Amino acid sequence: MVRRLFIFIFGILTFAVAQAHDGPALRRVISPSQPAWIIHIDTWNSPNPQAIINMVPEDIKPYVIFNLSLSATESICADGKKVVDSWMKVCAENRVWTMIQPASGGCSAFDDDDLELYESYYKNYPNFLGWNYAEQFWGFDEDRERENGTVHTPTFLKRLELFTHLMKFAHQYGGYLCVSFTQACYSANMMPVAYMKRNAEMNRLLSTDKEHFICCEKYTMKNGFYDIESNCLGAYLGGYAGQYGIRFDICGWMEEQDKLDENGNAIKDPSDDTKTLKEYYNDFPKACGAIPILEHVALTGETVIDGPELVTTDDLREIATSKTADGYIRRNWAWFNHFKNINIDMFRKILDGTIRIPSREEVIARTKICVKNDIKPKDINSSQNEMEPYVSPSGLYDGLYRSEQDDNGTQWPNSTVNNKWWLKVSGRYPAIPVVYDLIDEEARKLQVAIKSSEYASNPTWSNVASKKAYMNQLFKQEYKGDIYASRLENTWVCYNPYQYNEEHVPLAATNHGMKYIRKYWVNNGRSAKGTLKPAYNTCSQIKMNLAPYSLVHMREYSDKLSLYMQNYRIKDGLRYGVGDGRLQDDKNLPEYAQQTDTIIVVGASAQPTISWKDNSDHSASTVTSEWKNGQFTVYVKHNGPLELTIDNCKGTKTTGKLKDSDVTAAVIETPAAPEAYEGEMQYEFEHFDYKNVGGCYGNAWNNGFRGYYGQGCLNLGTQRGASVRGYIPVTKPGNYKVAIRYQASMGDAVIKVICGNQTKQVTLPKNASSSKEWSEVEFDMDIADVKGNMTVNYVSGKRAVLDCVRLNYKGALTGIAGVTTDADLIDHVEYYDLQGMRLSAAKQGISIKKVYLRSGKTYTEKIYK
């Protein structure tokens, strides 16, 4: 009864969140109990949206928002509208939540002035959740060459004006605007604080209706990570962003850089003086990207996980084709093993309550202070960048959680440029939010510890030792050692903080302010140790010795410890770039050697016991333990996620301990599904299985085609037996207007179209005027199976290139007596042989299919298999 009452109360609270703004309810609530994972259907993968949707595990899918990600590269995404107009229909039919990413930087697939277009997706698609804009710091106010001429990108202020309209649409229709921020130095005037200072209408909208704004930190650039975190966290805690998220990007890793001489100048390539020599350090260690996601979700309340990027090297890729039993060739896509072992597995731990997302109120209470950036910009309308009015005061993080290796104070005079690490060396101090202002009552529970305008002259903050002393009074010491360890209630987030094993090489003389060369060698041997003071457990100490890039999420209870451990990596030195064919095969992505992490419990009254299990799919781990001199030591040798429980883990340290019963329980609620879509369906022929065809072009640009929908097309050719077959689900059985878009440049082509037991022979007339124009032919066809296939066979005539097929419902099935209404849906299906014997499924050859409709009516047909 208690549990039911809690769920009822929680449901009321969730409803209240959805109704918090003055407008329609949010289509899909995002909150700590309903987190969102944005998974990309990305044009760089030439994907089949249906295949990507099918790949997402069913337990995760309700929480996923699919992101239709459009490239600014014309050859990848020639016409963004033609891509999303096709893919949105597939997502709508699947009833999965979907956003559109029209732009990275200033380059956009859509005109910033076409407001009717932006609104139309809300009107047409009940599953549409809004717009996702990435990397809003580059490419503004520039000429960009296209095949048919030059286009000029908008200014940043013009884009900000568009965002005000998108916020109003989000308010009107219950959607979101998601923006990811990734350059705190050279584009500081495009950070979240700048949204409040540079556009009065945006300020008003974010101040009064913040629920529609998702503010994400992004890791694309190789500097300024702490500033980006502080600015985005400040927007969330300060009350001008409804949600706080993370879009991790491997591009932030220092894989290589220009090779420099003793004077700090780039060394020219002797074989090509237009290029410079590169010094290679290491491929990105995948586990290093898991750390900020888990840290920020568990400690600072991020409710949105976007990506990660790069999608083509870290999420999924198109792999080798396969052949069906009846000879069709099928295109395939697959997750990378590191995506499965890190991202899918960690999200599952959020959904099962292991990793609890704290509320905004909890994060504010834990964070305690903020920095208020009160510096007035010189000219808000100028494109000239300023840093001081928009980001943190220089030196804010020094002596707190910034590594001395990362800055050392002297490489460059700009502290933000020097910040190459996102890992933190201390978990004692929470991430410091930088705010424009404290907008609402909850935000005002934060103390403004210092204003930016006063930072340099303030003796407490401008001096590292005094700043640290001030922070030590606010945040007590709960552990010792060189690991990162931070606690919220009974949860500890711990990791090895050594992102790089840096080498600093002094220059012969200072070069434009640079005093030494930084070399970013991977940490392949430096472990980190720490001793934690338990807050709930009654043993005296918990010690950890963590290998490079190891991450531990630990929950302590009075008599046990529950640990989730993560360190998945692939072999170093592979150096595969985007488009490398070797990425198609997992055999070319071997695992990294297993590393050993050690957990030591000190002060248990009796020998504890352990239980553990490997998660996901990686080499089998080995876990051993020993009990000696009052210490219980667990050795975990692994490369990948596992769960470890240390039971009977209790001692005599009971004074001052927090109670297990006071721990906040994680509550996860399944988000509501989108309403059913009743509109036009569209399917791309490049996603159909095929045999004996002239060619299947997943991206048809380089094959000379233009004006296609989706990203490609299929050359049916003229071979005997040429055929394509694709999955074409519809919302209900009935008679449909079928439109096939095609090119027939050399003459008429005749095809046979088959849906279920109905066949139509269709002539595709020769293009009237141009060999490159697309034509359409329309005809009516009954579609009885709502989850069926369409087959198109070549019959005679000239070559036809097939682009897509559209399906529009007209009315009831015409070929079946007794079906008279468009409300008839299939209840169940039975199969029989020709002797009338019931079958469990259709058999090879001829079977009888009997369909029972929900109205009580039935129809029968012969099927051939």
Predicted regions and their residues:
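Glycan-processing catalytic domains of CAZymes
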Residues: H21-V505, T510-G513, W521-T531
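Edge beta-strands of extracellular beta-sandwich domains
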Residues: K653-K657, D803-C804, T858-Y864
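Positively charged n-region of N-terminal signal peptides that target proteins for export
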Residues: M1-L5
